[in-house]
Amino acid sequence: VYREVFAILKANDEYEKLVFITGITKFTQISLFSALNNLTNISFLPEYATICGITEQEITSNFMPELQRMAEVNGWTGKETHDRLKEYYDGYHFSEDNMADVYNPYSLVNSLNQSRLRNYWASSGATTLLPKFIDDMEIHLADFEDCMIIRNVIGTSDVTAGGAELFLYQSGYLTIKSVEGNVYHLGFPNEEVRQALYECVLPALTLRKSGDIQSLQAQLYAHMDAGRLEDAMKVLKSLIADGPYS
């Protein structure tokens, strides 16, 4: 199906002024897409670093009424609302030469529309390739807060052969934090993504079904919010009781 679509695009290029294609991986080197071999990869170009998200300036210019409404609904100040949105949905960087912060547009728009902080991006559907890397994540989950990847690997077309770091970067779970020479430092862009990844791997870490974990999490949050520390510890012990020691 993809080959046919891209073959049509190439055959009719005289009628096309601009074509923008986005996804989680660069595919110009993959034989399946050889029918469309005249692409320009703009993934890391500084002039396009903010093309797929929402910037601080765009929030100020376009979303202040929605931000103010969200502040009123939740009893927050305007600054508190902005800071919470930034913590949850901001933090993406797409070019070492233009490290402008970019918000996840899907999550930000949904949050402002509903006046709630929720994991909107995660609930839109986790990638089916994620379980392939569960074993690596069990051992190195905390390392993804700050991990490194070589420059010529980060743009590799085969995400399944580049390790968990490459896949998590290209699928949006990690972003560029800084660059030193030929090494990219990657990390979680924001709180929404951090929580989403941890929830994805929690069933494997605890050897429990997702439904069981959600029930125990709800109990844990309720006890913590009410200050019932002993009850919270009982739930926590139950949650991790079957987990491996290593």
Which role does the model predict for each range below?
Residues 1-246:
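Phosphate-binding site recognition
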